[in-house]
């Protein structure tokens, strides 16, 4: 009887362990891809990334793609850029900063091993640079000008440089490229960009972080009739 009870207990424990393993596997798969099958990961496309920037569960799916090593590097970079482009929800830029129960780009990058993170960030930088160089969209006749997407990319560049004392960006060359991109962006349409209320990090905050290099090109803009002369003078 004792051996029978032992065998029965062993079978029960094995069954319980298998059940728990299956549950854990399902939870892991759900977190990793936000859908019901692991095989979907290899089929994730840029179109999926674009769509997820606008859906309710999209932020979780983008984080899952960015952080999981089963996805190709380029689609992980695309997920990161999708989080940069994601519009504010409820007045919060959850793509970059996340929210209480949902990590954003910065927290997701922190969770990735440094060697892999460096590869992802180094591929993000040229795309951030390109978007920050684009001209603001023009207003159509009788309509307000569309939102300038370069603000989102500027915010991401600044966040990468400064989050957790700058540890997300490891290479000095990449750091310098981001700094130059931020200076160029800030010196373009300076007065207008100074007043944009939707940006996460104001132009003045960015320039103060960049120091003397950031404001070196402001003095030539101090001409009679220029907008925001007092603000420029304060920065210099």
Where do the PLM segments sit?
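Extended repeat-based scaffolds of very large eukaryotic assembly and lipid-transport proteins
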Residues: 42-236
